[in-house]
Curated annotation (Swiss-Prot):
Binding site for ATP: R12, G53, K56, T57, T58, E119, D120, F121, R162, Y172, R209
Encoding gene (name): ruvB
Domain notes: Has 3 domains, the large (RuvB-L) and small ATPase (RuvB-S) domains and the C-terminal head (RuvB-H) domain. The head domain binds DNA, while the ATPase domains jointly bind ATP, ADP or are empty depending on the state of the subunit in the translocation cycle. During a single DNA translocation step the structure of each domain remains the same, but their relative positions change.
Enzyme Commission identifier(s): 3.6.4.-
Family that this chain belongs to: Belongs to the RuvB family.
Entry keyword Hydrolase: yes
Protein name: Holliday junction branch migration complex subunit RuvB
Disulphide bond pairs: none
Function: The RuvA-RuvB-RuvC complex processes Holliday junction (HJ) DNA during genetic recombination and DNA repair, while the RuvA-RuvB complex plays an important role in the rescue of blocked DNA replication forks via replication fork reversal (RFR). RuvA specifically binds to HJ cruciform DNA, conferring on it an open structure. The RuvB hexamer acts as an ATP-dependent pump, pulling dsDNA into and through the RuvAB complex. RuvB forms 2 homohexamers on either side of HJ DNA bound by 1 or 2 RuvA tetramers; 4 subunits per hexamer contact DNA at a time.
């Protein structure tokens, strides 16, 4: 396990009350958790969706902790065969949580095993082959499936409709991100001023994972150049040297906009063409870069392709 992974785990909140941001989702989740505990039943199946780094995995861990049950984690691409999932389901304890990250990448054959398990807590297994094959129903303990996806549109309707709770995670406000990095700084022993937290928070692309990563790198600059103190000026200088601008755009964000404007007149241009021009994968652009650029008003997605906005021209000091 790497040092960064250990650090990430150490700063994850363990309780729902310690989770910062996503106020409406958090308030609703408190009701769902308390109701499940009160009734002594497995919580209804939950689907979290939203961009990477917003806290889907953390929320699954919090749910298990709050309910006092085990959390079994896997991911869609790992579940290659229906038997893989069946083995996991039959080993779950009563009311345990099964967390499936990237659930949209689960094969259809595996997905179909989930249907009776989610609805009736039963597995339909085929024993044998050919004319002698027969279907056997096996009971599994009542459990809660927690799915996480960055691309809810790729989930099949039958699977999506079996989730009783579907919650979207939004980008975080700069104020919430400042609180998150301040909390992380206390845990890891970083000397972060209130102004330094605000500076990091407003450049973190609305994403806690990025905010904590920037804090670690800014702390390096503070250790070498500022006696360990992370002030607003130090944070601004460090982030500038890392090519993270005041809007949170990094080198790749700006390259994407510059290619769109300078090579294609601001668009519209197809995503595949744009990906080739930027030497980047289509999925990476769609999942990592586009959502934030659209959220900030630098990019528009149209039926004819991607278009740079007037705000993008102004941000890059280019004439539109």
């Amino acid at each position: 396990m790497t040092a960064n992974v250990c650090l990430d785990e150490s700063v994850r909140p363990r309780l729902l009350d310690d989770f910062i941001g996503q106020d409406e989702l958090r308030a609703n989740m408190r009701v769902y958790l308390d109701a499940a505990r009160e009734r002594g039943q497995a919580m209804d199946h939950v689907l979290f969706y939203g961009n990477p780094g917003l806290g889907k995995t953390t929320l699954a861990q919090i749910m298990a902790g709050e309910l006092g049950v085990n959390l079994v984690s896997t991911s869609g691409p790992v579940l290659e065969r229906s038997g893989d999932l069946a083995a996991i389901l039959t080993n779950l304890g009563r009311h345990d949580l099964l967390f499936v990250d990237e659930i949209h990448r689960m094969p259809i054959a595996v997905e179909e095993v989930l249907y009776p398990a989610m609805e009736d807590f039963k597995l339909d297994l085929v024993i044998g082959q050919g004319p002698g094959a027969r279907t056997v129903k096996i009971d599994v303990e009542p459990f809660t499936l927690v799915g996480a996806t960055t691309r809810i549109g790729l989930l099949s309707s039958p699977l999506r409709d079996r989730f009783g709770i579907i919650s979207r995670l939004e980008y975080y406000t700069p104020a919430d991100l400042a609180r998150i990095v301040a909390r992380t700084a206390r845990i890891i022993g970083a000397n972060l001023t209130e102004e330094g937290a605000i500076e990091i928070g407003r450049r973190a692309r609305g994403t806690p994972r990025i905010a904590n990563r920037l804090l670690r790198r800014v702390r390096d600059f503070a250790t070498v150049h500022a006696g360990g103190v992370i002030s607003a000026d130090l944070a601004s200088e460090a982030l500038g040297r890392m090519e993270v601008d005041e809007s949170g755009l990094d080198q790749m964000d700006r390259k994407l906009l510059e290619v769109l404007i300078e090579h294609y007149g601001g668009g519209p241009v197809g995503i595949k063409t744009l990906a080739v021009a930027c030497a980047e994968e289509v999925r990476t652009i769609e999942d990592i870069y586009e959502p934030y650029l659209i959220q900030c008003g630098f990019l528009k997605r149209t039926p004819r392709g991607r278009v740079a906005t007037a705000k993008a021209y102004r941000h890059l000091n280019l004439l539109g």
